Curated annotation (Swiss-Prot):
One of its GO terms (biological process) is regulation of transcription by RNA polymerase II. Residues 130-157 have a biased composition (Polar residues). It comes from Xenopus laevis. A zinc finger (C2H2-type) spans 285-310. Its main location: cytoplasm. This is Zinc finger protein 395. Keywords: Cytoplasm, DNA-binding, Metal-binding, Nucleus, Transcription, Transcription regulation, Zinc, Zinc-finger. SMART domains: c-clamp. Pfam families: DUF4772. One of its GO terms (cellular component) is nucleus. It is found in: Cytoplasm; Nucleus. A motif (Nuclear export signal) lies at residues 171-180. It comes from the Eukaryota.
């Protein structure tokens, strides 16, 4: 039997294997045992611990059988203890008679008191499993159709298994914890409540004024923040009273609104002054056509300017394709920061505004525009920049000539007007400056003299496109190294100026 086990299990050790060996009495009965010592050499003797607490050595030549192997090749003697399965449960029986011809064994089950007849293949010399000693299993009824698996399933009934928690519930708890944490750290919880009684309009105006430089008339240089005296446009939503920036100590002081304010608000003293804008570099596009020098802000506008004003539109569009790329260049212009507005009291604004005319050139002509009741037609703000601002759109060549409204010999503003219709009074400015004087002076002062820039030069003397000499035409494409830098970069030729 040991050789059969070794063939079945390969090179695995036989230690601990359950075997059946003859008893020491020599009556031929096989009893259940377990291998304790294996023979070191093939064909040697191995020791086994048998029932009754004694050990026996037996050779590895088949004198012992596996406890779970069929007993067809062995003879069972009367009174020998065997194990059978009856109604899904294992019972111990005693052999009464072993019939080798029919291969049947007559048994007597002591626990049930029954005489049974079973096939030899259904009889085992050792029990398959230990009997269950738990009271739960003893109380469970056994049905005739039950199998051995029912006993195994009933084992899991006595194990307390906790209920499974879904991942969604755990995620909801995590989200709830995060929400509570964020609420505990919010400014509404941390900041103290405002207990002082403050007029609502005053508080709202103070909140709106935060963050911007306010001019005399109420308009702000920072978009989105307005002063109390400005009610023309829709302001940005004010901050809440629970914001950490505004505490009860700030709102404890009461103020009286007198129209013009000369002193800043108390809560602005602790905050840093608004940062001044540094000199920024603005990229412009300059027309390289002789005696033109037009400056525009977009490349589309300068291309359209060159194409419409200098090259002209005609039928030979294939020859003029992308020709406007040679007649403009990119320049960088420094933009000076705006001068900060200086607050001025009503008493100091009594002097009338004097508009000094600029000496007109011979080609200029004066245009008298009807007085329009708008902030642009009265006066300019004192917060105007100290340098010349050239304000015009990319398509200014399609609009009217730029109109100059001089304020002083050194400070004036050029404003281009978009041609909305043929009549001048219906023109709308592209950009305007807000007023900084009282309404009485705005009604009294009107613009009487507006000097216009010279009209566009006539296109009668300009050369037809294609007649001007270029490095590309003089030297040819094959001698590109002899071209000027402007021609290499597809700009207007600087070597052959016509």
């Amino acid at each position: 039997m040991a050789s059969m086990l070794s063939k079945r299990l390969g090179k695995r050790s036989l230690l601990g294997a359950r075997v059946c060996a003859p008893t020491l009495s020599g009556d031929g009965m096989l009893v259940d045992g377990q291998m304790s010592i294996q023979a070191e050499i093939s064909g040697g003797f191995g020791a086994g611990a048998l029932e009754g607490g004694y050990c026996k050595e037996f050779p590895e030549d088949g004198s012992c059988a596996s406890a779970m192997s069929p007993t067809n090749r062995f003879k069972l003697y009367p009174g020998q203890k065997v194990y059978i399965t009856h109604n899904g449960k294992e019972y111990v029986g005693l052999v009464e008679q072993h019939n080798h011809v029919d291969d049947e064994v007559k048994l007597f089950v002591l626990e049930l008191g029954l005489h049974l007849c079973r096939k030899m293949e259904d009889v085992r010399l050792a029990e398959t499993q230990k009997p269950l000693s738990s009271p739960i299993e003893q109380s469970l009824p056994t049905s005739p159709g039950a199998t051995s698996t029912s006993a195994q399933r009933s084992v899991s009934r006595s194990i307390d298994v906790p209920k499974r928690r879904s991942d969604a519930v755990e995620m909801d708890e995590m989200m709830a914890a995060m929400v509570l944490t964020s609420l505990s750290c919010s400014p509404i919880v941390q900041s103290p409540p405002c207990t002082d009684s403050i007029p609502a309009p005053r508080v709202t105006c103070d909140l709106w004024k935060e963050g911007g430089d306010v001019s005399d008339s109420g308009s702000s240089t920072t978009s989105g923040h307005w002063s109390a005296s400005s009610g023309v446009s829709t302001p940005s939503p004010p901050h809440t009273d629970a914001s950490p920036k505004y505490t009860s100590e700030v709102f404890s002081a009461s103020h009286v609104d007198e129209g013009f304010e000369t002193d800043p608000d108390p809560f602005l003293l602790d905050e840093p002054a608004p940062r001044k804008r540094k000199n920024s570099v603005k990229i412009m596009y300059k027309c390289l056509w002789p005696n033109c020098g037009k400056l525009l802000r977009s490349i589309v506008g300068i291309k359209r300017h060159v194409k419409t004003q200098h090259l002209g539109d005609g039928l030979d569009s294939d020859q003029r394709k992308r020709e406007e790329d040679f007649y403009y260049t990119e320049v960088q212009m420094k933009e000076d920061p705006e001068a900060e507005p200086t607050p001025k009291s009503p008493s100091s604004a009594t002097a009338p505004l004097l508009i000094q005319p600029v000496p007109a050139k011979p080609e200029t002509h004066a245009i008298e525009v009807p007085s329009v009741e708008s902030p642009l037609s009265s006066a300019l703000s004192q917060s105007a920049p100290g340098s010349f601002w050239h304000i015009q759109t990319d398509h200014a060549y399609q609009a009217l000539s730029s109109i100059q409204i001089p304020v002083s010999p050194h400070i004036f503003t050029s404003i281009s007007w978009a041609a909305a219709s043929s009549t001048i009074p219906t023109l709308s400015p592209i950009r305007s400056r807000s007023l900084s004087f009282s309404e009485q002076q705005q009604q009294a002062i009107k613009s009487h003299l507006i000097v216009a820039s010279p009209p566009r030069p006539s296109n009668g003397n300009r050369k037809i496109r294609g007649e001007a000499k270029k490095c590309r035409k003089v030297y040819g494409i094959e001698h590109r190294d002899q071209w000027c830098t402007a021609c290499r970069w597809k700009k207007a030729c600087q070597r052959f100026l016509d």
